[in-house]
């Protein structure tokens, strides 16, 4: 079984998906981590962190590196790089590289392969998870929140290294890019459960989702 969670950046997808995976006993996957790892690969390939590389060059670089899945984490050449991919430098470039159709195809293929060759249940979160990657998921969720709430969440995650105004501006740019992508854009899919998390705590959101999930299972019996 797959529970797919979609929504904009900093809407709570990762935190909620992780918590739900514990409560429901599902494995957790974040597609965003894959795109961030690929962005890290790109950044390691040139001197200036403000430069961008072409799609063909990035596709070749990805093929030269080993991205593997271990339990609930993606590894780059056997290394857990989570502490290297959650920063403003990655934030600035990840939407650009994730707009490359070839890169999206690689990520989507890897996600589907992980699920295909496993008997486990999964909670998978990320943009376009409910529309492109796993539109047939048994339960689809779209999490949302106001731009100010999302900026505040990101501010707390980053220990105040950027101002709220900078984070809000970055998120607005990210939203605009994500909603206007040629392929895999951010949008509501048919049959999705929409939930605004702006003024709800983690436990409250998880309880609402679990209640809705259990009700859906009862109705489908």
Curated annotation (Swiss-Prot):
Protein name: Cytidylate kinase 1
Gene3D superfamilies: P-loop containing nucleotide triphosphate hydrolases
Domain of life: Bacteria
Entry-linked SUPFAM superfamilies: P-loop containing nucleoside triphosphate hydrolases
Similarity field: Belongs to the cytidylate kinase family. Type 1 subfamily.
Residue sites binding ATP per the record: 7-15
Species this protein is from: Borreliella afzelii (strain PKo) (Borrelia afzelii)
A GO BP entry: pyrimidine nucleotide metabolic process
Entry-linked HAMAP family: Cytidyl_kinase_type1 (MF_00238)
Single GO MF annotation: ATP binding
Keywords associated with the record: ATP-binding, Cytoplasm, Kinase, Nucleotide-binding, Transferase
Annotated catalysed reactions: CMP + ATP = CDP + ADP; dCMP + ATP = dCDP + ADP
InterPro entries referenced in this protein's UniProt entry, alphabetically: Cytidylate_kin (IPR003136), Cytidylate_kinase_dom (IPR011994), P-loop_NTPase (IPR027417)
């Amino acid at each position: 079984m797959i529970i797919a969670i979609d929504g904009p950046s900093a809407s709570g997808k990762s935190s909620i998906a992780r918590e739900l995976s514990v409560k429901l006993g599902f494995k957790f996957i974040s597609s965003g981590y894959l795109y961030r790892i690929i962005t890290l690969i790109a950044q390691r390939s040139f001197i200036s962190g403000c430069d961008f590389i072409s799609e063909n060059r990035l596709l070749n670089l990805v093929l030269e590196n080993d991205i593997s899945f271990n339990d609930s984490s993606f590894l780059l050449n056997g290394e857990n790089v989570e502490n290297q991919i959650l920063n403003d430098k990655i934030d600035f470039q990840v939407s650009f590289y994730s707009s490359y159709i070839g890169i999206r195809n690689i990520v989507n293929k890897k996600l589907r392969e992980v699920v295909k060759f496993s008997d486990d249940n999964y909670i998978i979160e990320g943009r376009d998870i409910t529309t492109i990657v796993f539109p047939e998921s048994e339960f689809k969720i779209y999490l949302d929140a106001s731009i100010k709430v999302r900026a505040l969440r990101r501010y707390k995650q980053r220990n105040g290294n950027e101002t709220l105004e900078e984070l809000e501006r970055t998120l607005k740019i990210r939203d605009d890019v994500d909603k206007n992508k040629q392929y895999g854009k951010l949008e509501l899919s048919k049959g999705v459960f929409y939930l605004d998390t702006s003024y709800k705590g983690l436990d409250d959101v998880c309880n609402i989702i679990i209640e809705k999930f259990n009700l859906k299972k009862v109705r489908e019996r």
